[in-house]
């Protein structure tokens, strides 16, 4: 078992996947605050590794996200973008790790009283969000600081995880990691 945080990649096989829809809904609540309304995300430049936002329709049905996990597999943070390919997602994580000092954290108020989350931006573009709601602003700030510290030195996995239905068993791997990465 690893003693350090890791960045894992999760691939979705359909844009209608309920886990993707849940992720989009949560992200929408996080970015509905001032972060999303005051700052206009820049359009990606040619060759840019930043993922597309899922609301712009530019991503494919086979898409994925990344998640920052603690050594005990607890989610510390997640990508703010949906990525069309595994290669783009992994390249963006490596690019972000090199620029952690440029990251700006903002706490946001959730959809109901007593819920708080956080969003991290680089150059006014949201790149990472909390993975859950917190009960207090101070807990939110502490969680964000911990996520940023972990992200700086997190191990970046070499392959994506294919999402499976809740309660279903993961099939034995019949294809290699390269083939799985290519399918996303």
What are these regions (language model features)?
Residues 116-134, 146, 169-184:
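C-terminal functional regions that serve as terminal interaction/effector modules
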Residues 5-8, 19, 49-77, 109-127:
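Short aromatic-glycine-(Arg/Gly/Cys) micro-motifs in beta-strand/loop hairpins
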């Amino acid at each position: 078992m690893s003693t350090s945080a890791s960045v894992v990649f999760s691939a979705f096989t359909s844009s209608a996947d309920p886990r993707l829809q849940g992720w989009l809904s949560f992200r929408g609540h996080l970015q509905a605050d001032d972060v999303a309304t005051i700052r206009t995300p820049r359009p990606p430049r040619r060759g840019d590794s930043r993922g597309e936002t899922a609301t712009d329709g530019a991503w494919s049905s086979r898409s994925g996200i990344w998640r920052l996990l603690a050594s005990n597999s607890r989610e510390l943070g997640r990508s703010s973008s949906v990525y069309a390919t595994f290669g783009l997602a992994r390249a963006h994580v490596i690019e972000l790790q090199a620029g952690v000092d440029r990251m700006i954290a903002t706490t946001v108020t959730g959809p109901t009283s007593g819920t708080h989350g956080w969003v991290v931006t680089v150059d006014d573009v949201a790149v990472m969000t909390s993975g859950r709601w917190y009960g207090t602003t101070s807990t939110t700030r502490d969680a964000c600081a911990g996520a940023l510290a972990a992200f700086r030195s997190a191990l970046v996995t070499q392959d994506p995880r294919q999402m499976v239905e809740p309660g279903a068993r993961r099939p034995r791997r019949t294809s290699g990691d390269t083939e799985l990465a290519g399918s996303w």
